[in-house]
């Protein structure tokens, strides 16, 4: 069989027309949406969260994006000091971000322990406030 080039075909540019429901099925009250497609499959509760946990535990990237963090740093520094033009070196911002993320991850780990102690799996604001209170007491006892 000889090989030949195929020419481009014209398309109508739309979806194929839907089939009309027969009069019998229309009388039964079957909606076209329910009979047309199957129910969309969903993951079981918690499996997506576990997948995200595994992904973030594998990665070494920053959890907070760089530019929003940089803007937040600049706004905090502007509020604290009177200087109008403040510049940061890239490694300085990266080290501040690294330290902040380590602190926040530790805070949420301890808050999760508080939630488990209360026989819950959801972290509430009261868990975070408890962790902060316990940490401040620990710091005061060390400094005395």
Swiss-Prot record:
InterPro entries (UniProt xref): Histone-fold, Histone_H2A/H2B/H3, Histone_H3/CENP-A
Post-translational modification: Mono-, di- and trimethylated to form H3K4me1/2/3. H3K4me activates gene expression by regulating transcription elongation and plays a role in telomere length maintenance. H3K4me enrichment correlates with transcription levels, and occurs in a 5' to 3' gradient with H3K4me3 enrichment at the 5'-end of genes, shifting to H3K4me2 and then H3K4me1. H3K36me represses gene expression.
Domain of life: Eukaryota
Modified residues (N6,N6,N6-trimethyllysine): 5, 28, 39
Keyword annotations: Acetylation, Chromosome, DNA-binding, Methylation, Nucleosome core, Nucleus
One Gene Ontology term, aspect cellular component: nucleosome
Modified residues (N6-acetyllysine): 10, 15, 19, 24, 28, 39, 58
Subunit structure: The nucleosome is a histone octamer containing two molecules each of H2A, H2B, H3 and H4 assembled in one H3-H4 heterotetramer and two H2A-H2B heterodimers. The octamer wraps approximately 147 bp of DNA.
Protein family (similarity comment): Belongs to the histone H3 family.
Reported function: Core component of nucleosome. Nucleosomes wrap and compact DNA into chromatin, limiting DNA accessibility to the cellular machineries which require DNA as a template. Histones thereby play a central role in transcription regulation, DNA repair, DNA replication and chromosomal stability. DNA accessibility is regulated via a complex set of post-translational modifications of histones, also called histone code, and nucleosome remodeling.
Protein name as it appears in the record: Histone H3.1
Protein species of origin: Encephalitozoon cuniculi (strain GB-M1) (Microsporidian parasite)
Lineage: Eukaryota, Fungi, Fungi incertae sedis, Microsporidia, Unikaryonidae
């Amino acid at each position: 069989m000889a090989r030949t080039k195929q020419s481009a075909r014209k398309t109508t540019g739309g979806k194929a027309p839907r089939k009309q429901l027969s009069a019998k099925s229309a009388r039964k009250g079957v909606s076209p949406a329910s009979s047309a497609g199957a129910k969309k499959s969903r993951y079981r509760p918690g499996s997506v969260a576990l997948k995200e946990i595994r992904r973030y535990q594998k990665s070494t990237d920053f959890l907070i994006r760089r530019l929003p963090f940089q803007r937040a740093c600049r706004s905090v520094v502007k509020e604290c000091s009177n200087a109008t033009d403040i510049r940061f070196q890239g490694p300085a911002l990266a080290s501040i971000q690294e330290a902040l993320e380590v602190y926040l991850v530790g805070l949420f780990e301890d808050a999760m322990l508080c939630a488990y102690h209360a026989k819950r799996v959801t972290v509430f604001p009261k868990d975070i406030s408890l962790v902060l209170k316990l940490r401040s007491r620990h710091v005061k006892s060390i400094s005395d």
